[in-house]
């Protein structure tokens, strides 16, 4: 069945195909039944109870338009966004490119989204009752020295509607954003956001975990430094990781020269190495959500064995269809 759908989608430019997929999922979300049952393989992470450890990665549903549709595909949790305080168009099109030979995707979207207020309204309208993460970022026009303001605005607005909030400082498509991953800049950001989290937890009488999403393009020394900051600031989780700027695994393939972040199967080895190094430093103190290149039972299990507590995918679903979600949920063996 999906092979026919894929053939139709792959006849379109990548971003057009994504648009039609979101529209179809919006319609699917209105159906009184699910096309796929949600496999129960429960796990508790960050104080949250997940139906299974397989989640939708951020980037698939930036505005939270199709939450109920994605829920019918069997995910154990869903992460929407990245969302910014103000709506923005992102970078010029075309900005998404399939690397067919390697089952990868390069994007330079640049946080295109309709703004945090629109996302919140969409979340409020959704009937999904599973774990929902909301991924927050900064506007392209906001100077990097004022980035904290954007994260605080988004944190305040989404806090009541998310089960956990992800702070995205690792997209390669927003100028200078990755600079927030290092040293004093990271310490300042985390300290201020944890202070806000404490205030919001008291205000709403509910603690919502705060997660950091980091890049796979880090040296061992940088990973050690980030892990130290995560522990000192008592972050609740970390997503390892975002898209990569490396083209090592797709050299010579069509579109490999395009600028942007690479996701999908070619990212698997790099992201798994990131998880492994991070896990050694965190020593179980902070849970890891493994993201980047999950494309099979074996690749997912490798990430769990490296130290991940949960998994996220998106690109593999484009290439293989939603059956991979149930297969992973049934067969992944948690540590």
Swiss-Prot record:
Pathway: Pyrimidine metabolism; UMP biosynthesis via de novo pathway; orotate from (S)-dihydroorotate (quinone route): step 1/1. The active site is at residue 171. InterPro entries: Aldolase_TIM, DHO_dehydrogenase, Dihydroorotate_DH_1_2, Dihydroorotate_DH_2, Dihydroorotate_DH_cat, Dihydroorotate_DH_CS. PROSITE patterns: DHODEHASE_1 (PS00911). It is a peripheral membrane protein. It comes from the Bacteria. Its main location: membrane. Monomer. This is Dihydroorotate dehydrogenase (quinone). It comes from Haemophilus ducreyi (strain 35000HP / ATCC 700724). The lineage of its organism: Bacteria, Pseudomonadati, Pseudomonadota, Gammaproteobacteria, Pasteurellales. The gene is pyrD.
């Amino acid at each position: 069945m999906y092979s026919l759908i894929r053939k139709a989608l792959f006849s379109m430019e990548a971003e057009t195909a994504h648009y039609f997929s979101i529209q179809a999922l919006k319609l699917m979300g209105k159906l009184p039944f699910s096309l796929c049952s949600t496999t129960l393989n429960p796990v508790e992470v960050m104080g949250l109870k997940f139906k299974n450890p397989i989640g939708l990665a951020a980037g698939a549903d930036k505005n939270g338009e199709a939450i109920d549709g994605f829920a019918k595909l069997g995910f154990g949790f869903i992460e929407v966004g990245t969302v910014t305080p103000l709506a923005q168009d992102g970078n010029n099109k075309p900005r998404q490119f399939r690397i067919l030979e390697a089952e990868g995707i390069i994007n330079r979207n640049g946080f295109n989204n309709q703004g945090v207020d629109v996302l919140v309204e969409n979340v409020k309208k959704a009937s999904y009752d599973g774990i929902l993460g909301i991924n927050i970022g900064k506007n392209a026009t906001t100077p990097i020295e004022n980035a904290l303001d954007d994260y605080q605005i988004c944190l305040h607005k989404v806090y009541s509607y998310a089960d956990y909030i992800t702070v995205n400082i690792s997209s390669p498509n927003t100028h200078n954003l990755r600079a927030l991953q290092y040293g004093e800049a990271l310490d300042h950001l985390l300290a201020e956001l944890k202070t806000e989290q404490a205030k919001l937890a008291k205000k709403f009488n509910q603690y919502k975990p705060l997660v950091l999403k980091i890049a796979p393009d880090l040296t061992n020394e940088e990973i050690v430094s980030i892990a130290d900051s995560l522990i000192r600031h008592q972050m609740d989780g970390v997503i390892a990781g975002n898209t990569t700027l490396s083209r090592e695994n797709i050299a010579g393939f069509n579109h490999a020269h395009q600028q942007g972040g690479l996701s999908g199967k070619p990212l698997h080895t790099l992201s798994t190495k990131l998880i492994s190094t991070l896990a050694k430093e965190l020593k179980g103190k902070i849970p890891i959500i493994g993201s980047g290149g999950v494309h099979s039972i074996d690749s997912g299990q490798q990430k769990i064995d490296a130290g991940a507590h949960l998994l996220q995918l998106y690109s593999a679903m484009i290439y293989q269809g939603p059956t991979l979600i149930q297969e992973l949920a049934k067969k992944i063996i948690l540590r």
